[in-house]
A protein has these predicted regions:
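Non-membrane alpha-helical structural segments and their capping/turn regions in soluble enzymes
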Residues: 5, 27, 64-75, 94, ...
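Hydrophobic alpha-helical connector segments
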Residues: 2, 6-45, 90, 96-100
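Short secondary-structure transition hinges
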Residues: 34, 38-75, 128
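Secondary-structure edge/capping motif, primarily at the C-terminal ends of alpha-helices
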Residues: 14-22, 51-55, 81, 115
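A short small-residue
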Residues: 53-58, 92, 120-124
Length: 147
């Protein structure tokens, strides 16, 4: 759990960075959000591991510490959505958050594919579209925002 401590801090910094802009379009917001994760492959790799087991085996005080910080990052995202998209209904903002945050747990395995996986997909006839962390994240955020 110790390695995950910097996840909420990163999100808080990312939200703070976005808060420096008085206004952003949906596309610009998606772009900024994607850029905050683009260089965080290690974070995304940790998140894609068996998170449930990691939390289950963590000491209660560490897990609580993480959950407090995680809650702060959810609230930071809500503040950004409220600032940039005041016309968006609260339910839609919540839908964005509760779709985007779980989505982050799957970014790494969809964007970092080793040669063995690539070869297996090719042999299996899987028409897989390879995307970067930025591309996948930006597409998801744009879709969730209706952009």
């Amino acid at each position: 759990m110790r390695n995950l401590q910097w996840f909420p801090g990163h999100m808080t910094k990312a939200m703070r960075m976005m808060e420096e802009n008085a206004a952003l379009t949906k596309d610009a917001f998606a772009d900024r959000l994607a850029k905050t994760l683009e260089k965080r492959s290690q974070l995304l790799k940790i998140m894609s591991m068996n998170h449930y087991d990691m939390e289950s085996s963590s000491r209660p005080e560490r897990l609580t510490e993480f959950k407090v910080a995680y809650g702060e990052s959810l609230r930071a995202m809500m503040r950004c959505l409220e600032q940039y998209f005041p016309e968006m209904p609260t339910a839609e903002k919540q839908n964005f958050i509760y779709a985007f945050f779980p989505f982050m747990f799957g970014i790494y395995p969809y964007t970092v594919v080793n040669e063995k996986q690539r070869e297996a997909m090719e042999k299996a006839g899987v028409n897989y579209v390879f995307m970067t962390i930025y591309e996948l994240t930006c597409k998801c955020a744009r879709h969730l925002l209706g952009s």
